[in-house]
């Protein structure tokens, strides 16, 4: 049994434990906080893992500061529904399902309810346009679908997402070395329970800035109203830069909660609230920073790519990454602890990128009945 302390990287540890089959015990979870123990979204995440596995054993002490997790078999299944709450976005839960779903006994078909877009977690738009194309490179192709049924902005959410994931016997080793040149930029400016004028203003500002760098920029406007618009007003922008070699780099920003819903209210709140133009500019600059950092995979999806490289057949996988995030650095440590795999890391001084190389462990889907 592996032992850890503290609440950091809780989700990483549960995912790696489930895939590796190694039991874990986490102690001192926020034991010095005013409200010690697991948070509601962490408990919800454990319930989700319990729904898609069979034989998992989860023990939490009375204060919630210690958890023992003995993983079971990933079974997947259809017709599953999960309430994600309003503290974290649906993306927080979908990221874990992407890691676990391909190795289930049966294909996964699940509906998750909550917040579809926020500034903390990956939004569903980014997962659809950037994360899923990366997963397809590992051989998970047919039947990998994510669909927004309802959009839900913070603080009340009300969104709904359907995620379908096929199963595979094993992954395919990858060689993502050539990042290529930027070919085009695409995006989605969305608005819920608010005038479409807001998303149009975000779109115009971002497009104007990006056209200074490349002529092929297209951003669509996506306005939700009525039943499909969730319970809170909000707007945001997701941008994706596609390269000549098929790599995707993304950036996203969401409006602050408690935004103004009319032009008059917006004028009153200018000193404390971000205008749509500010948000468009912030997102465009965030995308330009991702492009400047380089790499074949953006900063949001680094850890996912490294995990799948470890799970690949016993073959060499290589990937070129840009600036390494603290989250990715910690995840590399988790991969070493759970799977015993280390990476060969080669910095490239010319492109300011880093080349990661590893030998896969030959992970096979032992849960499936037959193929």
UniProtKB/Swiss-Prot annotation:
GO terms for molecular function: RNA endonuclease activity. InterPro entries: RNA3'-term_phos_cycl_insert, RNA3'_phos_cyclase_dom, RNA3'_phos_cyclase_dom_sf, RNA3'_term_phos_cyc, RNA3'_term_phos_cyc_type_2, RNA3'_term_phos_cycl-like_CS, RNA3'P_cycl/enolpyr_Trfase_a/b, RPTC_insert. GO terms for cellular component: nucleolus; phagocytic vesicle; small-subunit processome. Transmembrane segments: none annotated. CDD domains: RNA_Cyclase_Class_I. GO terms for biological process: endonucleolytic cleavage of tricistronic rRNA transcript (SSU-rRNA, 5.8S rRNA, LSU-rRNA); ribosomal small subunit biogenesis. It is found in: Nucleus, Nucleolus. Part of the small subunit (SSU) processome, first precursor of the small eukaryotic ribosomal subunit. During the assembly of the SSU processome in the nucleolus, many ribosome biogenesis factors, an RNA chaperone and ribosomal proteins associate with the nascent pre-rRNA and work in concert to generate RNA folding, modifications, rearrangements and cleavage as well as targeted degradation of pre-ribosomal RNA by the RNA exosome. Does not have cyclase activity. Part of the small subunit (SSU) processome, composed of more than 70 proteins and the RNA chaperone small nucleolar RNA (snoRNA) U3. Belongs to the RNA 3'-terminal cyclase family. Type 2 subfamily. This is Probable RNA 3'-terminal phosphate cyclase-like protein. It comes from Dictyostelium discoideum. The gene is rcl1.
